[in-house]
């Protein structure tokens, strides 16, 4: 009986401890222009812990870079931003994103042309959707 409780405690400790220690870690997905440029810009922001380039959307499973860059897969070049929300808010990341890209260009960003380079935020919560929509409307209203 003693071993049962010890095993149960250790299981709970191992399974739930990482979640407790990473409670302030959040993830956001942004796309706009070349993902390497966006990756470098997000990596400079205090509170950002990791930035990884990749693809989202599309109709091809496990697309190759050459196919995505041709615009034939329907994917967007995106970055996954892992951040500590005690050090930087999602809203601050969105404001930084609007400055990194050209949100008024429907066919890419700067010299990167095509749907795969279009500006997009893939939100993963209602809060992220609200912040993304609200800040875009404010940007539109500012006519900047």
Question: What label would you give each PLM region?
Answer:
Residues 7-19:
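Bacterial N-terminal signal peptides
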Residues 22-144:
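Flexible coil/turn and secondary-structure edge motifs
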């Amino acid at each position: 009986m003693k071993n049962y409780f010890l095993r149960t405690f250790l299981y709970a400790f191992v399974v739930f401890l990482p979640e407790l220690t990473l409670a302030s870690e959040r993830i956001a997905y942004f796309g706009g222009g070349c993902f390497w440029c966006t990756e470098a810009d997000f990596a400079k922001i205090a509170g950002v812990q990791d930035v990884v380039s990749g693809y989202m959307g599309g109709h091809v499973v496990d697309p190759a870079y050459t196919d995505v860059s041709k615009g034939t897969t329907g994917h967007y070049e995106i970055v996954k931003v892992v951040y500590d929300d005690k050090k930087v808010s999602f809203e601050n990341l969105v404001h930084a994103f609007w400055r990194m890209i050209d949100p008024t260009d429907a066919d890419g960003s700067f010299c990167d042309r095509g749907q795969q380079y279009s500006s997009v935020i893939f939100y993963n919560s209602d809060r992220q959707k609200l912040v993304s929509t609200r800040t875009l409307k404010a940007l539109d209203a500012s006519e900047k």
